[in-house]
Amino acid sequence: MKYCLKYTNICTKLNKADEISIKYIEDKGLVDFMEKFSSQRIILRVEATYFPESEIRKLIAIKKTYPDYRFAVAMGGYVQELGRTLREAGIDFFESTPCTDWERFNYLIKEGVSDINLSGPLAFDLGNVHRVLNILNPTVQVRVTPNSCMRLNPNTDPLIGFFIRPEDVEVYEGLVDVLEFEGLEHQDTFYSIYAEQKMFIGNLNQCIYGFNKPIDNKGLISLFGERRKTCGQQCLKGGLCHRCYDLASLAKPMGDRAREKILETIKAEQEKVKSSEN
């Protein structure tokens, strides 16, 4: 698993990151920055929709010396002029906004993005994402933001939103390539929790942005992440799976018998899901 940290003056773990993300500003010491972090990939965040030809020529020249950089472009769902200009110049780029549906996923891959930023339903269907990428372009990197709970309606239960607990990072190995954190001022903290400690003691709403529900993280067992990576959000499709809710119930203080009963329910649920898939 690779880790991308957003650059700030207060971030002390930049040298440990595989990638460093920084807002792109023309003629603002880009070469010096790349030289300082020459062993890491640089992600240049840009909101512009157009670069003058002189800027493109400069970027092409920089790439000869520092080839491992790419642009994260705010495209609004479509590859606008800037994206096509970068592609034609041989400069890697991807969309900064998370992709959540298959139509947009296929569109972006065919437009030549180097990475694809996932959330929503696609992030619950990573087995199929991996399969399709192997067909369309296996070099594309999958990126996610693990510490942000994304869902359309913030008032719905956060358990239906996509996020990854620090304890579940290993579960996503081979399906996700890069983790990039929300929270500009707390990049050090999240790198420590996810990459070094690989655990968090406390309520999930203390480490996951947008998770507005107090669930004791240490009470969740490993089945939580294992199922979510490929569940396809069956709970929203009238399916039989409600494992997230059952496992969250286990995180609450309860007697041994109550815990056994919930585990029995989960096991029975697993058998129903397996039989429905056969």
What are these regions (language model features)?
Residues 1-278:
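Active-site pocket-lining/capping segments in soluble small-molecule metabolic enzymes
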